[in-house]
Amino acid sequence: MPELPEVETVRRGLNQLTLNRKITGGDVLLHRTIAHPFSVGDFLNGITGSTISTWHRRGKYLLAELSASPSTTSIPWLGVHLRMTGQLLWLNQDEPLHKHTRVRIFFEEEQELRFVDQRTFGQMWWVPPGIAVESVITGLAKLAVDPFSPEFTVEYLANKLHNRRRPIKTALLDQSVVAGLGNIYADEALFKSGVLPETLCTEVQLKQIKLLRTAIIQVLETSIEAGGTTFSNFLNVKGVNGNYGGVAWVYNRAGEPCKVCGDVIQRIKLGGRSSHFCRQCQV
């Protein structure tokens, strides 16, 4: 699943390519991609004629701020969640359709934003002007603070973790604890901070939480600089792979030597997800 760095990479690409471009129409090939409460017709009618002012990211959600009608001061929104395998690709309209194409958004000059999604879990929303974004895209209301927010302090993270009697890796995947963090970067941050993934939150010391907060920010920044991670489906808006996988410390490296101590990287199942770590470097 695309995590914060992959979604941020897509956001930056969209801001480079789609701003101030007029949406001329669209085509929804898989109707369930358009999330309730609005219909496919509402979605297409709502976005057609709009221009994109800017793209925002909240956790793993992408939010396009659309141009408002002259008669109102409130703005409509276009929301996207890539889920497991979603891709947003900026293409010429005459490009052959990929078999997993779900939604096409047409722009002037024969360009389009194409939503491709093999597993079909991805979703798109239209939020009319005058309606709170969180009332339509309800998952936004449950998100924790962003790791790049000033609110993501040591005290904040300690308060989120200390009363949870579950492995710290499992807690870090909870979007109400840290928004945008997923399996890849939780493993990487735990390695950088020297904490084993199965350590209970109640057993993590404050000095470890300080290291963990710093590590989370560092690994996310490093991955964004590398354009994210591609192990299976992720592509940026130009169809290019991310490169963080080549510099990963532990993720997807089971059986290989640790880059720090040379011990073998191990993998276990924790909460139904694979966790990668080094027994020598993490305690």
Curated annotation (Swiss-Prot):
Positions with a binding annotation for DNA: 100, 119, 164
Residue spans, zinc finger FPG-type: 249-283
Protein name: Formamidopyrimidine-DNA glycosylase
Gene: mutM
PROSITE patterns cross-referenced by the UniProt entry: FPG_CAT, ZF_FPG_1, ZF_FPG_2
Active site: 2-3, 60, 273
GO MF annotations in UniProt: 8-oxo-7,8-dihydroguanine DNA N-glycosylase activity; class I DNA-(apurinic or apyrimidinic site) endonuclease activity; damaged DNA binding; zinc ion binding
NCBIfam families referenced in this protein's UniProt entry, alphabetically: fpg, PRK01103.1, PRK13945.1
Organism: Nostoc sp. (strain PCC 7120 / SAG 25.82 / UTEX 2576)
Description of how the protein assembles with itself and partners: Monomer.
GO biological process entries: base-excision repair
Co-factor note (free text): Binds 1 zinc ion per subunit.
PANTHER family on file: FORMAMIDOPYRIMIDINE-DNA GLYCOSYLASE (PTHR22993:SF9)
